[in-house]
Amino acid sequence: MKRRNLLTAMGLGLGGAVLATPAIAQGPPQIRWPLAATFPRELDILNGGVEVLVRRVARLTGNRFVIDRDSSLLPMTDQPMLDFVGSGGAPIGLGASYQAMDREPALVFDTSVPFGLNARQQNAWMYQGGGLMLMRELLADHDVVPFPVGNTGSQLGGWFRREIRAAQDLNGLKFRVSGMAADVLRRLGGQPQRTGHAGLRTALEDKTLDAAAWAGPHDDLRLGLHKVAPYCYYPGFLEGNAQLSCYVNRHAWDRLPPEYREAVEVACADANLWVTARYDALNPAALKQLTAEGAILRPFPLEILRAAHRATEEQLEALASANGRFRKVYSSWKPFRDAQHLWFRIAENSFDRSASLQSPETSRN
């Protein structure tokens, strides 16, 4: 059975499972939706965000609109979740938009751009800077309505089997990265790889990979990457944030009562806050454990940061010149990014530096 016909075959249409009620009943309908998400079990925070979302929707609607995670709803191999949802495979699903950047390059702005925004800045652009409106306009052609639903925050720069001392060390480096980071690495002479989470540790161990960037300390610790690639570099300039998105099939969305739509929007915002805060709360302890287990932290050489920044700007400009849809989003995102970077240098970054001077960890070094 084709996935796009799943809901129709259930006799429900893309609006989801609306149970029949007598004509005299005017209350909100009873609706049940299956949810698709492919987060591996090791990613407990992202899976926890799914639970926050479904619980919140049920609570806000008095259990009349119920969303259940359905592990049998899986996109085809290499099919982005947003395409799966847009084609009718599920009424709702969670994923990372930059997985579909090969077909729609501007979707990188819905997840992460090298040297771009951090998690707070991403939320500011999405909710108050016009970003969410632009993403919804972009994804309307894909029959998807998107919502921010979580963010990993700043990530680590990657796990390497050997030290990286200069930009030339990136030449021929088989480096697992995601999204636009692959284009930047390619400009630096590296060989970007798309190895999935399940094969990461094995690929590093048997030298199929030289390095891998996954997420932050909490997730990386659970995957055990430090045990086979001990050199961990920072900052994570490739992904200063990584936003996850909730995708709702547009036809299913249009059939929802207004109060149910609002419940989804509120629940996604709650999950977005919960996931981001959870990562911030657990990453420090995970970083300590990583170093206690032998991880070797190293700052990226300034030469590499400068070369990567230059490559990023070149790639952004090239995409903007070649793609009108990318250019439209970029023209909003770039001035917002530049203004945020200036403000954060004056306020947030200077405060962080001064506050860290008084921290117990700093005073012992």
Predicted regions and their residues:
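An N-terminal domain-start capping segment
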Residues: 127-131
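N-terminal secretory/targeting leader peptides
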Residues: 2-19, 24-122, 132-365
